[in-house]
């Protein structure tokens, strides 16, 4: 549970809260985490229902009402026409998971994606 993990961090390391970026899985977790003193929060749609993930208007509205470090979503949604463009209206960084192919990563960055979760380390140097 996200809030329980955040509570444990807040209890054991209260002076380090500003160094953590807490990833919440549902909008209703935001206030619980923020009330513990965490200022850096990412909303990931990973555990939301498919219809909630696709409701870009609700996600943009949520981001307008709650300071976020970003919104994270599966790469499949980036392929949905208009999805990335709609979320860019939130004016927060967008992150996708999981993309390992460098060409796919570059294409996502061109779409406006700010960061990419990957299973790989740093890209190999180009010769």
Task: State each model region's role.
Residues 1-127:
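Short loop-to-alpha-helix "cap/lid" segments that border enzyme active sites
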